[in-house]
C-alpha cells in the first residue's frame, strides 16, 4: 500500500514538473492574450484556468498572459505557420 502511494505521488510530481507553460494565444488571430496589470492578474488567471485551456495558474508578463501547468494540447504563442494579424 505504501509503495502504491509513493508511486502515485511521484507520478503527480512528474506531471507538475513537466507541465507546459507559455503565452496564451488566440487561435483565430495568432496573437497573444494581452494584459496591462503586470504580475498577479485576475483576468489572465481566469483565462488560463478556463476549461478549454486547462492551465493551473496565469499572470501578466510582458503585457501578455503567461500560463503555467497547461496540457500539451493547448496551443501557445507562437502558432506554427500563423503570425499575429490584428484585423
Swiss-Prot record:
Record function comment: Beta toxins bind voltage-independently at site-4 of sodium channels (Nav) and shift the voltage of activation toward more negative potentials thereby affecting sodium channel activation and promoting spontaneous and repetitive firing.
Which GO MF terms does the UniProt record name?
A: sodium channel inhibitor activity; toxin activity
**Where is the protein situated, by its record's location annotation?**
Secreted
Question: What's the source species for this entry?
Answer: Centruroides limpidus
Main location per UniProt? secreted
Tissue-by-tissue expression: Expressed by the venom gland.
Q: What is known of its domains?
A: Has the structural arrangement of an alpha-helix connected to antiparallel beta-sheets by disulfide bonds (CS-alpha/beta).
Q: Which UniProt keywords apply?
A: Disulfide bond, Ion channel impairing toxin, Neurotoxin, Secreted, Signal, Toxin, Voltage-gated sodium channel impairing toxin
* Disulphides: 31-84, 35-60, 44-65, 48-67
Protein name as annotated: Toxin Cll5b
Describe the location of the LCN-type CS-alpha/beta domain by residue ranges: 20-85
Q: Which GO terms describe its cellular component?
A: extracellular region
> A GO BP term, please?
defense response
| InterPro entries linked to this entry | LCN-type_CS_alpha_beta_dom, Scorpion_toxin-like, Scorpion_toxin-like_sf, Scorpion_toxinL, Scorpion_toxinL/defensin
A Pfam family:
Toxin_3
Question: Propeptide positions, renumbered to this chain?
Answer: 86-87
Q: Where is the signal peptide?
A: 1-19
> What does the similarity note say?
Belongs to the long (4 C-C) scorpion toxin superfamily. Sodium channel inhibitor family. Beta subfamily.
**From what superkingdom does this record's organism come?**
Eukaryota
Amino acid at each position: 500500500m505504501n509503495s502504491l502511494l509513493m508511486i502515485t505521488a511521484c507520478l503527480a510530481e512528474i506531471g507538475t514538473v513537466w507541465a507546459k507553460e507559455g503565452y496564451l494565444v488566440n487561435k483565430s488571430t495568432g496573437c497573444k492574450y494581452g494584459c496591462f496589470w503586470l504580475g498577479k492578474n485576475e483576468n489572465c488567471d481566469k483565462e488560463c484556468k478556463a476549461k478549454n485551456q486547462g492551465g493551473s495558474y496565469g499572470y501578466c508578463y510582458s503585457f501578455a498572459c503567461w500560463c503555467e501547468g497547461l496540457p500539451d494540447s493547448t496551443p501557445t504563442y507562437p502558432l506554427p505557420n500563423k503570425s499575429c494579424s490584428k484585423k
